[in-house]
Amino acid sequence: MSQQMTLSVQKREGLGKGANRKLRTAKKVPGIFYNSEGKNIPVAIDGTQLEKLYETAGKTTVFNLDIEGETAPCLIWQIERHPYKPFFTHVDLFGVDMEKPIKARIPLKITGVAKGTKIGGRMEVYRDFVDVFTKPGSMPKVIDINVSNMEMGDAVHVADLKLEDGHCIYDSNYVIVRVSAPRGGKGEEGEDA
């Protein structure tokens, strides 16, 4: 990791709905920092700074959290958005120990056009993420799946994913993506109409 990002936050005293509304009015996002020792620290975060960090880091990049001068490595664990306005309403930050593996949800990116879809098949994507057991500093941001060589009836399972050393798939072996024959359509050849 060449240069780690930093997010500055302040501890917050007021808890509850009223205090959180006041924070949001001041363009701040209420949140909780769960540190690696098990402490929960309520924090207030500048909304614009959080949005910029989330665009870059997402949920799979470790960054430094600066809480009034104390720094800790962490991940965005969960984030809540307003239902129809473009801002965050709450964030959970998870402090990590860089030497201990964690379970993380890594997004999957399907690339290419399957050969089977060019002759009428349908691409069915069953899952757009996979749970991986890995150290926080080497966590992949996304896992690419190239489907260019998939024929009709082919499928990609979790066991088919190729990961770097040190990463372990946490999930059982299920189908991620499949190219299947189109539904309905004409009957089989030789069938009377």
Curated annotation (Swiss-Prot):
Ribosomal protein found in the keyword field: yes
Its biological purpose: This is one of the proteins that binds to the 5S RNA in the ribosome where it forms part of the central protuberance.
PANTHER family xref list: RIBOSOMAL PROTEIN L25/GLN-TRNA SYNTHETASE, ANTI-CODON-BINDING DOMAIN-CONTAINING PROTEIN, RIBOSOMAL PROTEIN L25_GLN-TRNA SYNTHETASE, ANTI-CODON-BINDING DOMAIN-CONTAINING PROTEIN
GO cellular component: cytosolic large ribosomal subunit
A single GO BP: translation
The family this protein is said to belong to: Belongs to the bacterial ribosomal protein bL25 family. CTC subfamily.
UniProt signal peptide: none
Name this polypeptide is given: Large ribosomal subunit protein bL25
The gene coding this protein: rplY
One Pfam family from the record: Ribosomal_L25p
Keywords: Ribonucleoprotein, Ribosomal protein, RNA-binding, rRNA-binding
InterPro entries per the UniProt record, alphabetical: Rbsml_bL25/Gln-tRNA_synth_N, Ribosomal_bL25/Gln-tRNA_synth, Ribosomal_bL25_b-dom, Ribosomal_bL25_C, Ribosomal_bL25_long, Ribosomal_L25_dom, Ribosomal_uL5_bac-type
Recorded coiled-coil stretches: none
Oligomer and partners: Part of the 50S ribosomal subunit; part of the 5S rRNA/L5/L18/L25 subcomplex. Contacts the 5S rRNA. Binds to the 5S rRNA independently of L5 and L18.
The UniProt record lists the keyword Transcription: no
GO molecular function, one term: structural constituent of ribosome
Parts of the chain that traverse the membrane: none
